[in-house]
A protein has these predicted regions:
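Conserved catalytic-site region of short-chain dehydrogenase/reductase
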Residues: 6-7, 83-85
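SDR active-site lid
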Residues: 108-189
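Residue(s) in the substrate-gating loop at a strand-loop-helix junction
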Residues: 80
Length: 223
């Protein structure tokens, strides 16, 4: 099966024609069922609660304390490359991670403005810096829940997943060097991210770039 947030929308509904389904293998459905639509709504809600609502509450609670009790406060958020690059079989997960990324980067700009304001007993609040870590798949328990086809097995290259230790070391190096912003891992995915940004903003005469990105995504996720 697979975690609903890492399934195609129709897979969450239980009727993906390509055979990637949350609980069933119904490929012949021509319309959504009420149960399927309810599962989509519940999946979106759970994913947004975990990736957007939770971080927003934590940031709202901790930022005032960090601004007034630390001289060099910093926040590290573990996002995902799925929040930067659209991917088949990851629609809900990509959407919630993208929202999480924009939440963090927007709050970063807000903290930049707030750093100039006074605080009780202090001339000004400290500037809170942010590092957004956007790794590819990591070798942990979540990887085991990724989309699985009933006949072909996993839909992605799990053998290429990052080691937890590698992600931790890279993150600590950036924090120690006070290099904030976005850390994409592995590095070659930064190129894919840049190409995705160009794909969304550049009006080109042919569909060559879009076709290239689409082929790469379909090959990567085998969908």
């Amino acid at each position: 099966a697979g975690a609903p947030s890492s399934l195609p929308i129709l897979g969450v509904a239980g009727g993906d024609p390509s055979g990637v389904n949350a609980e069933t293998e119904e490929r012949g459905l021509t319309h959504a069922t009420q149960d399927g639509l309810d599962r989509i709504g519940e999946t979106v809600q759970r994913s947004c609660d975990a990736n957007v609502k939770g971080p927003a509450i934590v940031l709202g609670a901790l930022i005032p304390l960090m601004q007034t009790t630390s001289s060099r406060p910093a926040v590290v958020t573990i996002g995902s490359v799925a929040g930067l690059i659209p991917a088949p079989t990851r629609a809900v997960y990509c959407a919630s991670k993208s929202a999480q990324h924009l939440l963090v980067r927007s709050v970063d700009l807000e903290c930049e403005a707030q750093a100039a304001t006074p605080a009780p007993g202090q001339p000004r609040r400290a500037r809170v810096h942010f590092l957004l870590v956007a790794p590819g798949p990591i070798k942990n328990s979540f990887v085991a829940t990724y989309s699985v086809d009933a006949s072909t097995g996993p839909r992605d290259r799990r053998d290429h997943a990052l080691g937890v230790e590698d992600v931790v070391r890279a993150t600590l190096r950036r924090v120690d060097a006070e290099q904030w912003g976005v850390l994409v891992m592995p590095s070659y995915l930064r190129v894919a991210w840049i190409l995705t940004c160009l794909d969304a903003t550049y009006v080109y005469p042919t569909d060559l770039r879009r076709a290239w990105l689409g082929r790469a995504a379909h090959r990567l996720y085998r969908y």
